[in-house]
Amino acid sequence: MMRTLITTHPLPLLLLPQQLLQPVQFQEVDTDFDFPEEDKKEDFEEYLEQFFSTGPTRPPTKEKVKRRVLIESGMPLNHIEYCTHEIMGKNVYYKHRCVAERYFLLMQYDELQKICYNRFVPCKNGIRKCNRSKGLVEGVYCNLTEAFEIPACKYESLYRKGYVLITCSWQNEMQKRIPHTINDLVEPPEHRSFLSEDGVFVIPP
């Protein structure tokens, strides 16, 4: 029987082993989650570290702060979807979950780093010490309003122009203090006021 098949249909049987030896072609499937591409390799490595790590996260680097915190002019800062769009675009999350709040600042990194050497003022929680900017900075405060797991995160976007409160940490490689977290963006009162020695807004009588 086999001899008859080979004689009758020689070509298909000869091509069959070649087809079996060809590499399997995988079809690309689009997903809702934006996995990092080659130019986002560092983001992907950070994602793996956050997802599988059981200890504290790495302190932020200069490049991470520039990618995750600082913004450029483009979409209007008072746009209702600003935070939802920016957070997903910058892949801001923690262990596959939405972050509860976030600040984006319209400024250069060098300007932000200089704040680390300003005087200490109370943070918004009243416990830790923060450094406050000397001038007003434009930015957006993002507050989570819907969902807890990516990519369904929805945020309320609030435009602010005020004094930035940040925490800083020492980086051995640069031998400098660098921004660690954005604690608050405090809008000054509309009426006449001044800052006390502790950096607290005081309304004169």
Swiss-Prot record:
<dbReference type="GO" id="GO:0003676">
    <property type="term" value="F:nucleic acid binding"/>
</dbReference>
<keyword id="KW-0325">Glycoprotein</keyword>
<keyword id="KW-0732">Signal</keyword>
<dbReference type="InterPro" id="IPR036816">
    <property type="entry name" value="RNaseA-like_dom_sf"/>
</dbReference>
<keyword id="KW-1015">Disulfide bond</keyword>
<feature type="disulfide bond">
    <location>
        <begin position="98"/>
        <end position="153"/>
    </location>
</feature>
<comment type="function">
    <text>Does not exhibit any ribonuclease activity.</text>
</comment>
<feature type="glycosylation site" description="N-linked (GlcNAc...) asparagine">
    <location>
        <position position="131"/>
    </location>
</feature>
<dbReference type="InterPro" id="IPR001427">
    <property type="entry name" value="RNaseA"/>
</dbReference>
<dbReference type="GO" id="GO:0050830">
    <property type="term" value="P:defense response to Gram-positive bacterium"/>
</dbReference>
<feature type="signal peptide">
    <location>
        <begin position="1"/>
        <end position="26"/>
    </location>
</feature>
<dbReference type="Pfam" id="PF00074">
    <property type="entry name" value="RnaseA"/>
</dbReference>
<feature type="disulfide bond">
    <location>
        <begin position="116"/>
        <end position="168"/>
    </location>
</feature>
<dbReference type="InterPro" id="IPR023412">
    <property type="entry name" value="RNaseA_domain"/>
</dbReference>
<comment type="similarity">
    <text>Belongs to the pancreatic ribonuclease family.</text>
</comment>
<dbReference type="GO" id="GO:0005576">
    <property type="term" value="C:extracellular region"/>
</dbReference>
<keyword id="KW-0964">Secreted</keyword>
<feature type="disulfide bond">
    <location>
        <begin position="123"/>
        <end position="130"/>
    </location>
</feature>
<protein>
    <recommendedName>
        <fullName>Inactive ribonuclease-like protein 9</fullName>
    </recommendedName>
</protein>
<feature type="glycosylation site" description="N-linked (GlcNAc...) asparagine">
    <location>
        <position position="143"/>
    </location>
</feature>
